[in-house]
């Protein structure tokens, strides 16, 4: 609604408003706040948001939905495999776990480098950027509180959801 009122390009500016940084920021904060209980819920929320990044986010950017994009996206397969491991309570091989951690650290560096390059090409207004950033971190929790009340959530699950909804826009939105 905010983007519509401001007459902004929904395909370019909706993903940063609806897809927060639940992975790199949200998971560690939830782990700190709620321990391993919060980590599980935060990871599940982050997985759903990542799926939205690589489906809804791509759909909005291209303005055309194609299942090819979904089937060509490695994170989608990684999440499916992770869900299968969790569902069947399988032990992750040590070499796979170690490799995943190493790739994670390398990926964070590459994503931040890509973000820096992408931001040099953006033309933006400081006023609009501040307004949209505040909209993201204010509207997310407001909507989350409505959801928490509607579904009668409580305890650490409600807290984790609230923390995750308050995260700023994710780097993936700008790449």
What does each model-identified segment do?
Residues 1-175:
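Alpha-helical transmembrane segments of multi-pass small-molecule/ion transporters
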